[in-house]
Regions:
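Hydrophobic transmembrane helix segments
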Residues: 21-55
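Cytosolic juxtamembrane helix at the C-terminal end of the final transmembrane segment
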Residues: 2-5, 72-79, 141-164
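Hydrophobic alpha-helical transmembrane segments
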Residues: 51-62, 123-144
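Interfacial non-cytosolic loop connecting adjacent transmembrane helices
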Residues: 37-48, 100-130
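C-terminal TM-helix exit segments that contain a strictly Trp-centered aromatic cap at the helix terminus
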Residues: 22-34, 93-110
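Membrane-interface helix-boundary signature
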Residues: 2-16, 47-53, 76-86, 125-131
Length: 164
C-alpha cells in the first residue's frame, strides 16, 4: 500500500466519527429546547421515555462511530477478521438506513404524502437539518474505505510476519 493510501486509510475511520457529530448535536439541541422545527419534538422532549430514546440513540451512534476509529489503530493480527465481519454487518445496516432515507426524500420531493421530519420546518430550519444530517449520509462510504484499509493493513502485517 502506497504512502498516500496509508494516510487516507488512517483518516477514514476518524471521518466516520466526525460525520455523526452534527446529527448528534442537532438532536441534543432539540432536547435542550432549541427550535429545530422538528414536527415530533414534543414526543421526545415531553416524555421521559422519548428523552431516553434520543439519548440512547446518541450513545449507540457515537459508540458505533468510535468503533470505526478502532479500525485505524487495532492490533490486526490479534482479532483477525472479526472487525471486518462486525464492521461489514454494521455497514450493511448503514447502507439500508441511508437507502430508506433517500427513498423517503425522493418520494417527498415528488409530492408524495410520506412522513418526514421537515413538515413544520421553515427554510432556515431545513438548512440546519441538511447541515446536521448531510455528513451522516457519507458514513457508509467512509466505513467501506476504512474496512478496506483495515484489510489491506492486515494483509501487509500478515505478509510481514510470514517473511520474517
Amino acid at each position: 500500500m502506497g504512502f498516500r493510501n496509508r494516510i487516507l486509510f488512517r483518516w477514514l475511520p476518524w471521518a466516520c466519527l466526525i460525520v455523526v457529530i452534527p446529527s448528534v448535536l442537532w438532536r441534543v439541541a432539540m432536547l435542550c429546547g432549541a427550535n429545530t422545527g422538528f414536527a415530533e419534538t414534543n414526543l421526545y422532549r415531553g416524555s421521559f421515555s422519548g428523552t431516553i430514546y434520543v439519548l440512547t440513540l446518541e450513545v449507540v451512534q457515537l459508540a458505533a462511530a468510535s468503533a470505526c476509529v478502532y479500525l485505524a489503530y487495532a492490533n490486526t493480527i490479534r482479532y483477525g477478521r472479526l472487525p471486518l465481519i462486525i464492521g461489514g454487518i454494521g455497514n450493511l445496516m448503514l447502507y439500508y438506513i441511508v437507502g430508506c432515507f433517500v427513498i423517503i426524500l425522493i418520494r417527498y420531493s415528488q409530492g408524495a404524502d410520506v412522513w418526514t421530519p421537515m413538515r413544520a420546518m421553515d427554510a432556515t430550519q431545513r438548512l440546519w437539518l441538511y447541515i446536521a444530517y448531510g455528513p451522516f449520509l457519507t458514513w457508509p462510504l467512509l466505513l467501506t474505505g476504512a474496512l478496506f484499509g483495515y484489510q489491506e493493513r492486515r494483509k501487509a502485517e500478515k505478509h510481514e510476519i510470514m517473511t520474517m
